[in-house]
């Protein structure tokens, strides 16, 4: 079936979303046009406004409509000397959902990857260096992903912390709650053994 230019453009635009291939994009486009034109208009409006009005927090670099996000403006969090380093704004949502952290964040928007040409300044480590130099951070919690790049990034940041005499800790990685050891991969199990906690 030959499709119109506008329909092709719509399907091609939908393919910019992660995990959306040609078939999924076609299904979405046809659904919006056949069954939910009102929803399509709302989606277009929300996307347009979000793209033009949402920027980055001047303190932590997460997404916000204001110059500074609500977490960074919270006086209680400002008094807490902990700074959690994450790779993306989605990681903040995950950490906040635990209810176990009451400090502030710094979002890298990625990780170090020399092979891809991503260096320290590309993920804001120059800004982090400046922020640690202000003296209001007592501990940095490194919550980068448990990947080779995430580990390398964490070690690099730990060196910056050392220069500023700021304590640096790494979140624990290991066997998930309810998991069975025989189903856990070797690398994860190795991290669990190395990061074990003393009970007595």
UniProtKB/Swiss-Prot annotation:
Pfam families: RecR_C, RecR_HhH, RecR_ZnF, Toprim_4. Keywords: DNA damage, DNA recombination, DNA repair, Metal-binding, Zinc, Zinc-finger. The keyword Metal-binding applies. InterPro entries: DNA_Rcmb_RecR (IPR000093), Rcmb_RecR (IPR023627), Rcmb_RecR_Znf (IPR015967), TOPRIM_dom (IPR006171), TOPRIM_RecR (IPR034137). Residues 81-176 form the Toprim domain. SUPFAM superfamilies: Recombination protein RecR (SSF111304). GO terms for molecular function: DNA binding; zinc ion binding. The keyword Metal-binding applies. A zinc finger (C4-type) spans 57-72. One of its GO terms (biological process) is DNA recombination. NCBIfam families: recR. Belongs to the RecR family. This is Recombination protein RecR. The lineage of its organism: Bacteria, Pseudomonadati, Pseudomonadota, Gammaproteobacteria, Vibrionales. The gene is recR.
